[in-house]
Amino acid sequence: MAKQLYDYWFVQFDFPNEEGKPYKSSGGKMVWNDKLKREIPAGWSSKMISEIEGNIVTGKTPSCANEDNFGGDIQFVTIDDIRGNLFVFQAQRTLSKLGADSQYKKYLPEGSLCVSCIGTIGVMGFVARLAQTNQQINSIIFGKEYNKEFSYFSLMLHFDNAKAKTGNVFANMNKEEFASIYIAYPSIELLQKYHEIVLPMFDTIKTNTSEILNLIKQQDDLLPLLMNGQVSVNSD
């Protein structure tokens, strides 16, 4: 539903006009944009990712020579952790406070958007708790909440279009190239309206994911106890 509404408003440009009617289908004015090489609604602009949200962090791996850098409470996110997950609650590896603090500028607060930029480009997900990533990932730390879902789907569209043109998205994209991606940017009012509609949908996915992970953990904790007879299942 969130993706469908994004496509309707920001791809087909049939967001509600002043009369509540679909903008483009109702004859809304479209203007050519040189940066995007296509028409966009009058009043919209083309903006780079760095102009929309300027806090972009490229991940880094702390020194593997010091084992004390790993195995703690800080999730160390890689592409495999993001793949298939809109929200990343847990990573395969973690960092200790020592390891994470050794590169303190790489901390990502909850809600930051991680985007793979080396190898398979365009794998994306939001961190659901304090985290850091490896160097294959660029992340956006949001200063404006209303940019979150819009940025996620806009980048998805960008990478899908790039794949359609080249046949694949296997390449490398450095921080500057990622920050320089242009997207069609609407009014703040429209962004806020979209954010208010889709946020509950994203929150539901986040809550459900958390509950599933908790159930899996309970199962993993209980199974060994059942196997060695420390607990039993009451069939009554």
Residue ranges and their predicted role:
Residues 1-5, 27-60, 76, 184, ...:
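Non-catalytic DNA-recognition/assembly elements of restriction-modification systems
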Residues 20-186:
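DNA target-recognition domains and sequence-specific DNA-contacting regions of bacterial/archaeal
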Residues 2, 6-13, 20-27:
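Glycine-rich, mobile lid/loop segments that gate access to catalytic sites or pores
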Residues 11, 120, 143, 157-161, ...:
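Short, well-ordered loop/turn and helix-capping segments at boundaries between secondary-structure elements
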